[in-house]
Regions:
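Nucleotide-activated chemistry modules centered on ATP-dependent adenylation/adenylyltransferase
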Residues: 1-247
């Protein structure tokens, strides 16, 4: 679920040719193509579905429920929702910080690094780890597929090493005739993980703080605090820790 900023609203208005005057920054969220908001009691209200035609040539926002005026719903702002959930969020943060301290002490001979994508989960993980250990190094794996804003962000992000592949994604497709599918997502295997695996010392003990959560998928629902990517890390002595898996 992503907060909807003015830039995205401008994109929607420009591409759908709809005024969408009832939408504004600071109150609405995009969740799996659904634009929704929450009232001040925390109840969810679904307003629009964002639909892209198969041709990718048309985008449309369709109202899901009859709201004569969305303004009639006493919507909570993002900040008000944070205040509504403040106790829960504070406890989540405290639990994560305690886990980070515990695992750092347990693996005290390991070198801590934080793989980051500039997305919400890895940025939250980085924030929590650096809250306790400010000098912890971050690593950004350049997939060659990220948007311009991501690259602008990573170039100014402190203490972050950018790991670049030998070939970009589309060069790889052309050279090796590899096409990604749901069951062969080689962009992740080769670019998001593979570049890091090829450049880090397999014999050095790294402690990797990973921004993965149990609620992301059925596969990740069973992950525990300590996790090792045996399939993609290969024969290494690396250890993964998931500080936000319960978020």
């Amino acid at each position: 679920m992503n907060p909807i900023y003015n830039e995205y609203l401008t994109f929607l208005r420009d591409t759908t040719k709809q005024p969408l005057e009832d939408l504004k920054e600071g109150y609405f969220w995009l969740d799996k193509s659904i634009i929704k908001g929450f009232d001040k009691q925390g109840n969810e209200h679904k307003f629009y579905r964002v639909k892209i035609e198969n041709s990718l040539e048309r985008l449309d926002c369709t109202k899901l429920k009859s709201y004569d005026n969305i303004a009639d719903v006493n919507l909570a702002s993002w900040q008000e929702l944070i205040e509504l959930q403040k106790e829960h969020l504070t406890q989540l943060e405290a639990d994560s910080l305690e886990l980070i301290k515990e695992k750092t002490e347990k693996f005290n001979t390991y070198t801590s690094i934080i793989p980051v994508s500039m997305g919400k989960d890895s940025m939250l993980t980085c924030h929590l780890v650096r809250k306790l250990y400010p000098e912890t190094k971050a690593i950004f794996n350049n997939t060659s597929l990220d948007c311009a804003d991501t690259y602008r962000m990573v170039k100014t992000f402190p203490n972050c090493e950018i790991m670049n592949p030998d070939f970009g994604f589309y060069q790889d497709v052309e050279i090796n005739h590899m096409y990604p599918t749901r069951f062969a997502r080689f962009c992740c295997r080769i670019y998001k993980v593979g570049v890091m695996v090829s450049q880090l010392d397999h014999n050095h003990p790294y402690l990797m703080w990973m921004g993965m959560r149990n609620e992301e998928s059925n596969t990740r629902s069973s992950y525990q605090d300590e996790w090792v990517n045996e399939q993609e890390w290969g024969k290494t002595c690396w250890q993964g820790i998931l500080p936000i898996r319960k978020w």
